Structures are given as structure tokens and as C-alpha cells.
Amino acid sequence: MIKTLKRIPLVFLIAIMACSNSGDNGKDKVEEQEQAQEQGEKKGQGEERDKEDGIDGLQPTFLADQDPKPDDKKWIKVEGVSDEFNDSELDLTKWSPTPEFIWNGQDRGWYGGSRSLFEADNVSVGNGFLRIEGEKFDSPKYSPKDNTDTPPQRRYGGAYVYGKTLAEPGYYIEARMRASKTAMSAAFWLKTETKPCGENLNDGENLEIDIQECVGVFTGELGDEWTKDDWAVNANWDRIFHYNTHRHNSPCNNIGDRQTKGGKANFDKKNSDEFHIYAAYWHADGSKIDFYIDGELEKSITPVIPFKGALRLIMSSNFYDWIEETSAEDMGFNRPLEDRYTQFDWVRVWQLEDL
């Protein structure tokens, strides 16, 4: 910035100094220039990362012959649920950094697994990334909804960031993301709003689309029944592309056990070692969801029922209930802060329009 001022002609500087309140105005001007430069540098960082990956950011990420767009349509970005994270703070007009969700005077938010606590303090934006810190507390904590008559059990801190604008059927939803180097999860997903079943937008159904869920460090599992199969236990949870559609039990459907259809693929490297672009094309009629990795179709899923209603878009980091607890060192919680971040480079959501 000093070099920039040196380039300004001396006569011009004298004229500025002669003006009333010139000191304050000059300071304000310099601060504005510094802020603009900082934002430009951050934007440049994101653009440079996109260039390295061969992405222009003006269209969804697809490899050759992978774009499902019909010839008479074009992709348009849905700005309300898209973000490059190039500002210095989270855009609170788009995102909530806390799971708190007050409906009819009741907090219907979900604050994490039984050993985890979602806290807004673990959410930050910097260097062109949305960052969710994973931490091990010095002592267990309560969530705002816990029964304080029993000892607290929440020992690990993460966060839950959700979009204030709901995602709709017909959207192509993608994020460039990397897991932390801890046992915390890294997840990009959609879920029915936590309203009473008769008041949500899914005809009372409690639906979920997991575009990606993994962990940064896999320490083993506790032996819950659902993890006692080859699909889960031996899935290499710290080097996985893991996607699902869930139809959960609710008072309105009484289906009993959750109904799930999904799949997985494994990477050569760990989820914490490299960024990937995780995406899903949610067909407009809700009958099918196509899951993509780095612009390539991995699998098309037909949910057990059509997913026809709008869902909440979520970025989160949780300590899964089925993960085995080992030492803080082994689980990565003694690592430097930068290693304990789950990072989202950007989130981009698209819809089709007529040409």
C-alpha cells in the first residue's frame, strides 16, 4: 500500500492534505483500499485454485460428456445458496452458523451426536475458505437442549452451518471440500427442516440426502449393529466418497427402521489429504438423484420414495456416535489448528432454465 501511495503525484498529495478532515478521510481511503486489496487477494486465491483444477466457476463442474443438461436448457447459478467464501466473515444473510432453529417458540435444532457439540465459535471464514474447527474440550459440555440433571457427555466440538434458503428439486449442488486431520466428520448434505411433520415441505416425511460424509481419521468403530458389515466397517471411512438417500421414521409415516439407498467409492489418498468436488443432481420430479465426484457421475440412486420437497443445505463436522474414542493424539486433536479445520472452498448451486 505504501508503494501505491508513492506513485501518487506530490501535488495531488498536498491538495488532499489541505482539505478539511483530510487525516480522517485519508485514513478511511487507505483502509478502503486495503480492504479492497484483501478481498481481491482472497478472490484471486479462489480463482487460482479453480484454474489449477480446470474450473471456470461460471458453470457446474463436469467432465466431458457428463453434463445432464438438455440441449434446450442452460445452467443458472442459484446465488441464495451459493458462496465462494471470499469475504472475511460468514455471510449471515445466507448461512446460519448454529443449529438453533426456533419454531413456534421451541428450539428444534440438532446440536450433534451424543459426544459432540455444534458451536458457532468453531465456524470461521479465512483465506477463501469456510472453516469448521474440530476440538476436544477440556471438560464435557451440555447443549442448550440437554438434561442438566445428568452429567454432560459432549467432549468434542464441531459445527453445523445451514443455508437460510432451502434447496429445491431440480438443483445441481456441488462443493469443493477437504476433511480435517481429526476423527471429526466432514459432511455436505441436505435434510428436511426440523418442523413438526405436518408443517414441513415434504408431506410429513423426514428426508435426507448425504452428498458426502467421511471422517478425517478413522480410529475404528464401537460395534453398533449397523456398522457390523463389510459395507461400513471395511469402507475406509477416511478415504471415502460416501453418499446416501434416507427416509427416516416420523410420526407421520411410522415406517419404523430408516429406509436407505446409497453407495460408496474409495480414494487412494485420505479425505484429509486432498480436495474433491462432491456433487448431486437432484432431478426435478424427485425420482432420482445422481451423485458426482470431481465432475464425473458415480451412481444414480432412485430413493424409496420421490424426494419432492425443499430441503435444508448443510455443511457440518460431527463426532459420530459409532466412532471409537482413542487418545487425543491419535484422533488428531493435538495437531495445529490448520490441520483441525474441515474446509469448504466454495459451494455452488445451479438450476436449469430455458435458452
Curated annotation (Swiss-Prot):
The active site is at 208 (nucleophile), 213 (proton donor). Keywords: Cell outer membrane, Glycosidase, Hydrolase, Lipoprotein, Membrane, Palmitate, Signal. Residues 22-72 are annotated as: Disordered. InterPro entries: ConA-like_dom_sf (IPR013320), GH16 (IPR000757), Glycosyl_Hydrlase_16 (IPR050546). It is found in: Cell outer membrane. A lipid is attached at residue 19 (S-diacylglycerol cysteine). It comes from the Bacteria. Its EC number is 3.2.1.178. It catalyses: Hydrolysis of beta-D-galactopyranose-(1->4)-alpha-L-galactopyranose-6-sulfate linkages in porphyran. Residues 1-18 form the signal peptide. One of its GO terms (biological process) is carbohydrate metabolic process. The keyword Membrane applies. PROSITE patterns: GH16_2, PROKAR_LIPOPROTEIN. It is a lipid-anchor. Substrate binds at residues 110, 208, 213. Residues 71-355 form the GH16 domain. Residues 39-54 have a biased composition (Basic and acidic residues). One of its GO terms (cellular component) is cell outer membrane. One of its GO terms (molecular function) is hydrolase activity, hydrolyzing O-glycosyl compounds. A lipid is attached at residue 19 (N-palmitoyl cysteine). Belongs to the glycosyl hydrolase 16 family. Cleaves the sulfated polysaccharide porphyran at the (1->4) linkages between beta-D-galactopyranose and alpha-L-galactopyranose-6-sulfate, forming mostly the disaccharide alpha-L-galactopyranose-6-sulfate-(1->3)-beta-D-galactose. PANTHER family: GLYCOSIDE HYDROLASE FAMILY 16 PROTEIN, GLYCOSYL HYDROLASE-RELATED. This is Beta-porphyranase C. The lineage of its organism: Bacteria, Pseudomonadati, Bacteroidota, Flavobacteriia, Flavobacteriales. The gene is porC.
